[in-house]
Swiss-Prot record:
Record protein name field: Calcium-dependent protein kinase 29
Gene that specifies this protein: CPK29
Positions contributing to ATP binding: L90, G91, R92, G93, E94, F95, G96, V97, T98, K113
PANTHER family for this protein: SERINE/THREONINE-PROTEIN KINASE (PTHR24349)
Segments forming domain EF-hand: 385-420, 421-456, 457-492, 495-525
UniProt KW Calcium keyword: yes
């Protein structure tokens, strides 16, 4: 098995001290990238000047001298503007924005994903970007993997020029088709597993397989489906085990929560996608994050609800074997592809799975977009506050002036100065900012991560998020306002289904109370933040397993061993 890159060494010392601000790179009195006259390549963040000051002590570069021009950051960005014309925005995420892009010479249509450096709040975030670029550059070409053309960097962002996918998300396409069958699900799963096998053969573990990370290249009926995001991927060697909790909650394998896993987690995540493809809802669902984690650990699969009684035995057998809680008896990617249901996909039942499945898929997809948009409103548009107070708090707690705090020093210090912060919140802060897992927080990470978690975690922001959607200030979110916010260019018809569920009193509009209920149901909306999700599920993992280190017994299921 070939390894396409080198994975992060565990236990490396990555601590950095708070330092002075670093001025952005300029040339001829202007920003090289970021000004409006530079073809709209401004950074997407509207975080306040205070947050900018905090983040300005990041390393000057993310990719180092790996920019396509060979001369490093700023020169690479100038080269990008010579080679490519940047167009309209295609979408936004937690770390940046994606825009249309065109090769200035050939006219080829591409996409430019710009990752804002101000959004890279810790060295883990920086390493995620470095790894993503390294993996996309080194992974051999595959028809169902989006191709990275070039990577550039400037003072504000990392820019990835890649294939453009304009055919929409996987679930959106399924919902739009209307007629949806088991045979169609089998064809989709074959494609997904081809990608997983390709990654595993080349020593790459994806670690974040979910429907949102699969897009169609174009709107044609026979368009290829492509995986687009390698932001959490890692390279591995046979037999290597990992303990970093990553991924999206619904798709997380039990051994991830147990902090001892290998490439088998990608099979589990694909199995969750398959379950959703066949019935429209996730297999492991609860009203709280802890409930979701517990459901994943229990791994009970419900085959009683519709349409499971009419789903073929072959399909159910494959779901069971992909969602086997024991990673050592779970199917490999090759075994999934050899399973009769996949091998004979054209023989799978071509009977519609029913309108209920299609409706559930639509609701699941649109609701996720609603919650992600709410997260972006908080992360992007609400001002950062209390920066100086947080830095002063760190200095107060750091009585020995070492530039870092242990978890116990943090706990005791907060008690001494009268801050009544719940243990869970203290644990979350440590989990989010303790980069190398050695129980130590440095100043910069304490400040930046506590700001981020405070903003994301506080329910006081929900009224402001509600106001963002309520454009006309009527006190209600009306359907046209929701369409404008969630689907300005896409198929707006799918937004209508939100009202069937969220609009409890059926008055054709969403009140604040209805909005609040929707935001608190199922997976916490704040888990759309990769950093928040990591912190929450790290804390839950320690709580569920009482800080017991778990080992994998090759002859049987997961067993626990004391530290």
């Amino acid at each position: 098995m070939g390894n396409c890159c080198v994975s992060r060494p565990s236990g490396a010392d990555k601590r950095r001290r708070c330092g002075s601000s670093t001025a952005p790179h300029t040339r001829g009195g202007r920003r090289v990238i970021g000004a409006a006259n530079m073809r709209c390549l401004s950074t997407v963040s509207s975080v306040s000047d205070a947050a900018r000051a905090v983040m300005s002590n990041e390393p000057a570069t993310v990719l180092g001298n790996s920019g396509s021009s060979g001369n490093g950051g700023v020169m690479a960005a100038e080269e990008m503007l010579r080679r490519y014309e940047i167009g309209e925005e295609l979408g936004r995420g937690e770390f940046g924005v994606t825009r249309r892009c065109r090769d200035a010479v050939t006219g080829e249509r591409l996409a430019c994903k710009s990752i804002s450096k101000r959004k890279l709040r810790s060295s883990v975030d920086v390493e995620d970007v470095r790894r993503e670029v390294a993996i996309m550059r080194s992974l051999p070409a595959h028809a169902n993997v989006v191709r990275l053309r070039e990577a550039f960097e400037d003072a504000d962002a990392v820019h990835l020029v890649m294939e453009v996918c304009e055919g929409g998300e996987l679930f959106d396409r399924i919902v739009a088709r209307g007629h949806y069958t088991e045979r169609a699900a089998a064809a989709v799963m074959r494609t997904i597993m081809d990608v997983v096998q390709h990654c595993h053969k080349n020593g790459v573990m994806h670690r974040d397989l979910k429907p949102e990370n699969f897009l169609y290249a174009n709107a044609s009926e026979n368009s290829p489906l492509k995986v687009i995001d390698f932001g959490l991927s890692v390279c591995f060697k046979p037999g290597a085990r990992f303990n970093e909790i990553v991924g999206s909650p619904y798709y997380m394998a039990p051994e991830v929560l147990k902090r001892n896993y290998g490439q088998e987690i990608d099979i589990w995540s694909a199995g969750v996608i398959l379950y959703i493809l066949l019935c429209g809802v996730p297999p492991f669902w609860a009203e709280t994050d802890e409930g979701i984690a517990q459901a994943i650990i229990r791994s009970h699969i419900d085959f009683q609800r519709e349409p499971w009684p009419k789903v073929s035995d072959n399909a159910k057998d494959l779901v069971r074997r992909m969602l086997d809680p024991n990673p050592y008896t779970r199917l490999t990617a090759q075994q999934v592809l050899e399973h009769p249901w996949i091998q004979n996909a054209s023989a799978a039942p071509n009977i519609p799975l029913g309108e209920a499945v299609r409706s559930r898929l639509k609701q699941f997809t649109v609701m996720n977009k609603f919650k992600k948009k709410a997260l972006l409103v908080v992360a992007e548009y609400l001002p950062t506050e209390e920066l100086d107070a947080i830095r002063e708090l760190f200095n107060m707690l750091d009585t020995k002036k070492k530039g870092h705090l242990t978890l116990e020093e943090l706990r005791k210090g907060l008690q001494v100065i009268g801050h009544n912060i719940h243990d869970t919140d203290v644990d979350m802060l440590m989990e989010a900012a303790d980069i190398d897992g050695n129980g130590i927080l440095d100043c910069k990470e304490f400040v930046t991560v506590s700001i981020h978690l405070k903003k994301i975690r506080s329910d006081e922001h929900l009224p402001k998020v509600f106001s963002f959607f309520d454009k006309n200030g009527s006190g209600y979110i009306e359907i046209e306002e929701l369409k404008e916010a969630l689907s300005p260019r896409g198929d707006q018809k799918s937004i209508d289904d939100i009202f069937l569920d969220v609009d409890i009193d059926k008055d054709g509009k969403i009140s604040y109370e209805e909005f609040e209920l929707m935001m608190s149901a199922g997976m916490d909306w704040r888990n759309a933040s990769r950093q928040y999700s990591r912190a929450v599920y790290n804390t839950l993992s320690r709580k569920i397993f009482k800080e017991v280190s778990l080992k994998l017994d090759h002859s049987g299921p997961l067993v626990a061993a004391g530290k």
